[in-house]
A protein has these predicted regions:
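Edge beta-strands of extracellular beta-sandwich domains
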Residues: 79, 124-141
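Short, aromatic- and glycine-rich surface loops/edge beta-strands on solvent-exposed regions
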Residues: 104-107, 111-125
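Fold-level signature of zinc-dependent metallopeptidase catalytic domains
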Residues: 141-191
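N-terminal prosegments of processed precursors
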Residues: 10-104
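Bacterial Sec-dependent N-terminal signal peptides
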Residues: 1-13
Length: 191
């Protein structure tokens, strides 16, 4: 029953978002006992490749969650669970004696109006999400990086429709030299 009510409360994409992305680069810092989060950079990107339906994640999966609220109405308009390597590192012996800071990125649909974002982390003791960061973001802010993106060569291997309703796989040519690009594409096609 809870799932059906959540589905009924889904957000209208066109009301709140454009088809661009807002990439949020943030640091997770801490050790075995504590963690904190801080935004490092905001970046406007030209495409939103995520869902335009089911913007509110009903499942609660992941060690972290991002929640996006419409500032004017305080309505939850986007949420997604995610995991990080920092979360894994916090469970190591090294984290008992050291504090580290790891950079992470998450993309949300680009808001049309000011929003409030929250990043929460699941506490292993009670399995509940607890607030790490809460910040207002104005999509018109001069502090959002809108610089030209680097031109990269992209080869589509298979295309089955708009990415908002599909799962995208990206193959990076790491380990291949510039002269081996044809081999890389052939290897990716074989996959």
């Amino acid at each position: 029953i809870l799932y059906s009510f959540t589905c009924l409360a889904q957000t209208n994409f066109e009301k709140h978002f454009t088809k661009k992305s807002l990439r949020i680069d943030f640091a997770l810092s801490g050790n075995w006992d504590f963690q904190a989060a801080a935004i490092q950079q905001l970046r406007e990107e030209p495409v939103w490749a995520g869902p335009v339906k089911n913007l509110i994640d009903p499942f609660g999966y992941g060690g972290y969650y991002i929640n996006v609220y419409d500032k004017a109405g305080k309505e939850l308009i986007y949420s997604r669970g995610f995991n990080t390597l920092f979360e894994e590192w916090r469970s190591t012996e090294q984290a008992k004696t050291e504090t580290q800071s790891w950079t992470n990125s998450i993309s949300i649909p680009y808001p049309k109006a000011p929003v409030i974002i929250e990043i929460t982390a699941r506490d292993k003791a009670d399995m509940q999400f607890h607030l790490l960061l809460k910040q207002e973001i104005d999509p018109a802010s001069i502090f959002i990086d809108r610089g030209k993106l680097k031109e990269n060569r992209i080869t589509k291997i298979q295309y089955n429709g708009d990415s908002s309703g599909k799962v995208d796989l990206v193959f990076l040519a790491e380990g291949y030299t510039a002269d081996e690009q044809e081999k890389f594409v052939a290897d990716a096609k074989r996959f």
